[in-house]
């Protein structure tokens, strides 16, 4: 909030402001930007040189013309523009990815299997290039700890189906296991 409050007076009024967060909703900050009609999100996936997607999400006050300009901008910089028409934590990619990662973590934290076997089950079973723990190593353990803690503490982020599938105590177990690894400087691979 403070960042936007300090930045807003320094920018010309024509300036469009975009955040790259896929966790925070633009509506949470729009009023602090001094230009809510020109404030929205432009979220890039990791490794944009090969996974060149850009999720564009406005908020209730975003001018539709500004939204369209940002979609066009994403196309101009050779991204695959993915318009998100309604605010949603996680946007498109992470709304699908996070439950997948949490499912892998649940299998590990419950003692069902080890990270390598879980990754092999996924990669060989689906043809995907990476399993959940390889992806966690890519995004970083600090991000994984943050995700687990957020999903543990914010009601409504986790779908009812996934809540039923996972034992509730596992969020605390997952968080502790990941934090211990982070504190030791460990990763799942390498």
Which residues fall in each region the model found?
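An alpha-helix initiation/capping motif
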Residues: 90-98, 119
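Short acidic alpha-helix initiation/capping motifs at coil-to-helix transition points
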Residues: 95-100, 124-127
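NAD(P)-dependent Rossmann-like dehydrogenase/reductase catalytic/cofactor-binding core
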Residues: 61, 65-68, 75-88, 105, ...
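Rossmann-fold dinucleotide-binding core
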Residues: 16-85, 94
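N-terminal alpha-helical segment
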Residues: 49-53, 100-101, 174
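Rossmann-like NAD(P)-binding element
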Residues: 1-16
């Amino acid at each position: 909030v403070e960042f936007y409050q300090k930045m807003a007076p320094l920018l010309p009024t024509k300036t469009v402001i975009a955040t790259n967060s896929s966790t925070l909703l633009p509506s949470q900050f729009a009023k602090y930007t001094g230009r809510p009609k020109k404030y929205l999100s432009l979220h890039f996936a990791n490794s944009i040189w090969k996974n060149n997607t850009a999720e564009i999400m406005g908020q209730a006050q975003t001018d539709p013309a500004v939204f369209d300009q940002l979609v066009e901008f994403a196309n101009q910089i050779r991204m695959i523009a993915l318009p998100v028409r309604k605010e949603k934590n996680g946007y498109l990619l992470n709304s699908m990815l996070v439950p997948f990662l949490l499912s892998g973590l649940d299998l590990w934290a419950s003692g069902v299997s080890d990270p390598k076997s879980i990754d092999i089950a996924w990669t060989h079973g689906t043809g995907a290039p990476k399993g959940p723990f390889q992806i966690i190593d890519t995004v970083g353990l600090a991000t994984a700890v943050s995700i687990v803690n957020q999903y543990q503490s914010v009601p409504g982020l986790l779908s009812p189906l996934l809540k039923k599938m996972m034992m509730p105590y596992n969020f605390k177990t997952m968080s502790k296991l990941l934090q211990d690894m982070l504190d030791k400087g460990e990763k799942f691979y390498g």
